[in-house]
Design a protein with these regions (language model features):
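Outer-membrane beta-barrel "beta-signal"
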Residues: 166-178
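Hydrophobic, well-structured mid-protein blocks that either form specific transmembrane helices
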Residues: 51-90
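Short loop/turn motifs that connect adjacent beta-strands in outer-membrane beta-barrel proteins
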Residues: 1, 12-14, 28-44, 68-76, ...
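Alpha-helical membrane segments in multi-pass integral membrane proteins
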Residues: 89-135
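Membrane-embedded beta-strands of outer-membrane beta-barrel proteins
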Residues: 22-26, 61-65, 93-97, 131-133, ...
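Glycine/small-residue-rich interface belts in oligomeric ring/scaffold proteins
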Residues: 1-25
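Transmembrane beta-strands of outer-membrane beta-barrel pores
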Residues: 3-11, 46-54, 79-85, 99, ...
Length: 178
């Protein structure tokens, strides 16, 4: 299995807010000790996510598959049932991916995710597709350092399930991978 998590902290107009996600996944191949690869599927996993912020906790559970796609560092698809604290429960699909490549002696990485959730009686379907385009300047510090400079492009339709609340943003990015 694996684990992905992050915390965002924002401060605006004197208000301080935090949002986090913790996403542990349990590998059937890892638990069983058996190779369960078939076709492009490398593994099948139990997928969970805890989303939390000011005044809410959402719990997502379901299954995922890790895919073996040429040139991809990783590609996975997760299917969840979402128990939402403040809105009607829904379903979510999350795709995550990374494609490393070189230009001359420089290392680059394109990675990102796509979250799509279903519409329910009190909210619209939403789609958040965020991709980061990064250059590893860290290797000029040491071969193992992963310090990236780049840009992030985020397209978010019906943000927070609000119909017509759409964003299309490009941000500068400095990111360190542990």
């Amino acid at each position: 299995g694996d684990f992905f998590g992050f915390i965002d902290r924002t401060e605006s107009g004197g208000a301080k807010d935090s949002y986090f996600e913790a996403s542990p996944r349990l590998s059937f191949a890892g638990v069983s000790g058996k190779d369960i690869q078939f076709g492009i599927v490398k593994d099948v996993l139990v997928s969970t996510t805890w989303e939390g912020g000011e005044g809410f906790n959402n719990y997502l559970y379901g299954f995922g598959v890790d895919l073996d796609i040429p040139y991809f560092q990783y590609a996975n698809v997760n299917f969840y049932r979402a128990n939402n604290e403040n809105t009607a429960d829904d379903y979510q699909m999350t795709i995550a991916y990374a494609v490393p490549f070189k230009v001359s002696s420089e290392d680059f990485l394109v990675d990102g995710f796509l979250d799509w959730s279903t519409a329910e009686k009190d909210h619209a379907s939403e789609l958040n597709w965020t991709t980061q385009y990064k250059w590893n300047v860290g290797k000029h510090i040491s071969p193992e350092t992963r310090l990236y400079l780049g840009v992030e492009h985020s397209v978010w339709n019906n943000k927070f399930g609000i119909k017509g609340s759409d964003e299309n943003n490009v941000s500068a990015l400095i990111k360190y991978h542990f």
